[in-house]
Amino acid sequence: MDEQKNKDRIMQVATDLFQEKGPKFTMDELASALKMSKKTLYVYFTDKEDLFHHAVDHIFDSITDAKSKIITDETIELRERIIETLQVLPRQYQHIDFRQLYMLKDKYPRVYEHLSKRLESNWETTIELLEKRQREHVLRDFSIPVFKTIYESTLEHFFERDVLKANHISYPDALREVVEIIMNGISE
């Protein structure tokens, strides 16, 4: 098995453990679930923080790939492409309890900071879609930087606090609700 396949497998099992235990799972538990030695695990990731850092990249790279497919799909009406782009969550991550991400802030602040930076990046194609819809008068004139800030701040708030967990709202449901509220607020 090649190195990337091993890393992907490790991240998938780590994702499953994260879903089950949050960030509190141990590298021993991960190695056991993978049926590999901890020593082998550390060949791929220096520590749990490194694993989480790579997992953030893996998730956001998957989201970026999914967004690209949506944006270039001419069979989807433009307004629907905006909605789908804003609420995209690849199938392999639908089961993750993103509500637990707020726990990373204290224990793994560098990972959390990296997550925040990734959340704020790769907006170019979404912004192009919004601008196009404004030019076509399908969306009213509004400040795209304010729109982006509202969206990012809401998601960061979900990650920073346990508001979703406390109110028994899943991350995908919250994401759909946010997009619905935002889109209904900017539609002509």
Set out the residue ranges of the language-model regions:
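Hydrophobic alpha-helical connector segments
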Residues: 54, 68-95, 148-151
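C-terminal peripheral helix-coil segments that are non-catalytic and often amphipathic
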Residues: 84, 128-132, 165-188
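Short secondary-structure transition hinges
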Residues: 91-127, 135-136
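Hydrophobic alpha-helical bundle segments that form small-molecule/ligand-binding pockets
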Residues: 120-148, 155
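Helix-turn-helix
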Residues: 9, 13, 17-50, 54
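Hydrophobic alpha-helical segments that form the core
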Residues: 140-161, 174-185
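N-terminal positioning helix adjacent to the helix-turn-helix/winged-helix DNA-binding module
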Residues: 2-13, 78
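Alpha-helical DNA-contacting segments of helix-turn-helix folds
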Residues: 49-59, 63, 96
